[in-house]
């Protein structure tokens, strides 16, 4: 279910409605959305048959539901905490969608600049430079080395653009396939990204923030600590971090603390402030509260770091574009200067 519907469902339940009545009301608002309407109809039918909201969500086949979400709903239904859990789940999914949208919007401007720059450079090299320098070649004048270099690039691009285009898309498809189907490749790439300046910290903040929020949410829902840790580890998208936490989660099931298990385990060691906060939470039995604060801290940190990354990216791209255009302009003007000096 989407974040707005989870919050709406919680408000209906808070007003005294039954789950069935609330689902029917929400279903009536989404009749034009075929897949989502089918999902809601499936829930309504199963609840009418006497199934709980958890069983209906777990049984329906329209959408795949995250395990942590299902288990939180299951425990919340048994403990009478359904309303606050639905609100928290709605807030979580809403914040995740907002972060994704912010990153997408932030990358639009640099991407547009990059595409325009590539297009402009390709046009100059493929069409403008050959026509201008061709005039000087006809005179038998020796062209400057930079002009010869640009002409060589122009000839190469003009003669091989189809192969280059196929190769470009082939690399993208090959990378995506390797990342999806080769766990070894995924681990190597994810490990490399974690070591990248700024980007690595952005990734770790996002991964740890999401883990912290979900673990906090499930503990508030009444899920046992060991079970909550195991479910929360499934939310990691970075293979290196997921492997470290999965190994630690197994030790937690055996009775160890998560902070100790991560400290003694192999693989990626999480950030120091996360480890300190986790250890403090486990010592004081306030894991849910402390990790909830950590999740908010990482969200704010990432917002600031994303702005910094973009502020560095834009001037770098402008400098790169200026350098490329400058080389092309120099390649066109130097033969003219050489001719004037010769005359």
Where in the sequence are the language-model features?
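Catalytic metal-binding core of the metallo-beta-lactamase
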Residues: 1-112, 190, 194, 198-313
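Short, charge-rich, low-complexity alpha-helical interaction segments
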Residues: 7, 45, 178-186
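Transmembrane alpha-helix boundary/anchor motif
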Residues: 21, 123, 127-131, 173, ...
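Bilayer-spanning, highly hydrophobic alpha-helical transmembrane segments
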Residues: 92, 98-178, 297-343
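Membrane interface segments of multi-pass transport proteins and intramembrane proteases
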Residues: 137-145, 180-200
């Amino acid at each position: 279910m989407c974040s707005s519907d989870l919050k709406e469902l919680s408000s209906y339940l808070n007003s005294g409605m039954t789950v069935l009545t609330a689902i029917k009301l929400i279903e009536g608002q989404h009749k034009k959305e075929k897949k989502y309407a089918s999902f809601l109809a499936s829930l309504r039918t199963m609840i009418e048959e006497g199934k709980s909201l958890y069983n209906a969500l777990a049984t329906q086949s329209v959408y795949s539901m995250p395990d942590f979400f299902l288990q939180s709903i299951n425990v919340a239904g048994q403990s009478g905490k359904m309303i606050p859990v639905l609100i928290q789940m709605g807030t979580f999914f809403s914040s995740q969608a907002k972060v994704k949208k912010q990153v997408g919007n932030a990358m639009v401007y640099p991407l547009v600049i990059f595409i325009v720059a590539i297009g402009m450079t390709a046009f100059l090299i493929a069409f403008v430079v050959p026509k201008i320098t061709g005039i000087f070649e006809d005179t038998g004048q020796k062209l400057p080395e930079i002009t010869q270099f640009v002409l060589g690039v122009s000839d190469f691009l003009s003669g091989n653009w189809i192969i280059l285009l196929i190769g470009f898309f082939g690399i993208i498809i090959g990378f995506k396939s390797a990342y999806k189907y080769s766990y070894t490749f995924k681990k190597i790439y994810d490990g490399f990204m974690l070591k990248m300046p700024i980007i690595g910290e952005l990734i770790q903040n996002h991964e740890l923030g999401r883990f912290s929020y979900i673990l906090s949410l499930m503990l508030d829902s009444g899920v046992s600590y060991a079970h909550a840790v195991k479910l929360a580890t499934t939310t990691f998208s970075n293979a290196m971090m997921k492997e470290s936490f999965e190994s630690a989660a197994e030790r937690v099931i055996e009775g160890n603390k998560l902070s100790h298990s991560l400290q003694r385990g192999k693989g990626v060691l999480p950030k120091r402030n996360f480890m300190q906060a986790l250890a403090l939470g486990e010592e004081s039995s306030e894991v849910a509260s402390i990790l909830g604060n950590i999740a908010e801290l990482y969200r704010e940190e990432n917002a600031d770091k994303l702005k910094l990354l973009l502020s560095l990216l834009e001037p770098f791209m402008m400098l790169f574009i200026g350098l490329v255009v400058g080389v092309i302009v120099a390649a066109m003007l130097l033969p003219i200067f050489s001719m004037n000096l010769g005359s």
